[in-house]
Amino acid sequence: MTNKHFDLIVVGGGILGTFHAYHALLAGKTVLQLEKDNYPVGATVRNFGQVVPSGMEAEWFEYGVAGLEIYKSIQQEFDISVRNNGSVYIASDADEQTLIHELKAHYDTLGYETELLGQAAILNKYPAIKPAYAKEAIFFPQEISVEPELMIHRLQQYMQTKFKNYQLHYNSPVTACQRKGNGVEVGLKNNSVLFTGGKAVICNGYEFKLLYPELFSESGIVVSKLQMMRTVPMADVKLSGNILTGLTTRRYESFEHYCPSFQSIKTPEHYEELKKWGIHILFKQAADNSIIIGDSHVYADVNHFDDLGFDLSHHINELMLEEAARIVDFDVRKLQTTWAGFYPQHPTKHIVTYDLDDCIHIRTAIGGKGMTASAGYAAESIKNIFS
């Protein structure tokens, strides 16, 4: 059975694939998006929902800034859960203070709005932060947060409402994708269902076994497993926006690339075990007043993804809770759920791209910056695909 022809077929229903579909639709293309699961269940819905261009470097910062405007413009038309409460990085010692001052100097040269907060200002704005932790902070008022478990569904609902030339099919794992004539043919269910398109873009998340497994096995991609937790709703806690902490200043690429002191600062002894497990502490208060806490990072190469396991390490969760309790004055152990998320990344590339020919394009392994950078990156990617 062959269905109608589309200008673009997007394989993958996560944030990267969905924004590829969105920008193609804006360009007037007919788009079919195919998602293998009942609905998106991967990294797009298992994260903090923090959109933080301030943590990015080079063109990825630009993609993030463009993404802020895209999210905000869509929110004006349709509620996709965007809240504009800014991002704050809290320094807990002198080295971290040096880093935030150096980052401010960098962003001042770009004209990207930022503000330094002293301890009193931090405690006034974020009364849940412990005074002993908060030495100084850098605040980015224009940055946003979304509800990760809601946003992708709302975005796809918006696209279905706005664009008549958009089709979205769940429960549609693509098992074949090949060149056919001047376009591409995509197959489902042992090719009993076929779709044809002018072009296909594959945004496959951490699914590397259904399409082009040999290509991915040699790609150098690694998969990161992260652990996160959510508290019960805490209406009396005020912690708006994206809360990033001292460990984040020692990890994010913007600090690494733009802060001259980054390479010379020493890791305090109390951070050693945390760094071993790739832990840095973030908080994001959800719309229901529950608070997401995380996260950790352990890795396996793409050929040994299953070695990461589906279990949660109690030791890692305990390390995160102990550090979180050092930062905030509410009971971080009032948890309602904990989970593991997975995302692919590459050790030397910001994203993995393959143009198999002029019709079949792979865009994957965007790493931990999908929520921040996908909207802006996909705009440029679609221009290139259709150029």
Which ranges hold each PLM region?
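Active-site substrate-recognition segment that forms the wall
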Residues: Y22-H23, V51, S81-V82, N204-V332
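Short hydrophobic core segments
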Residues: I9-V11, L194-E207, A378
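Beta1/beta-strand and adjacent pyrophosphate-binding region of the FAD-binding site
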Residues: T2-G14, L32
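Helix-loop-beta segment of a Rossmann-like dinucleotide-binding subdomain
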Residues: S81-Y89, L123-F163, N303, D358-I366
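C-terminal catalytic lobe of FAD-dependent flavoproteins
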Residues: G278, A287-I292, V298-S387
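Dinucleotide-binding Rossmann-like beta1-alpha1 core, especially the glycine-rich loop
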Residues: F48-K125
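Glycine-rich FAD pyrophosphate-binding loop
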Residues: L26-V45
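Helical element adjacent to the flavin cofactor pocket in flavoenzyme catalytic cores
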Residues: F139-G187, F195, K199
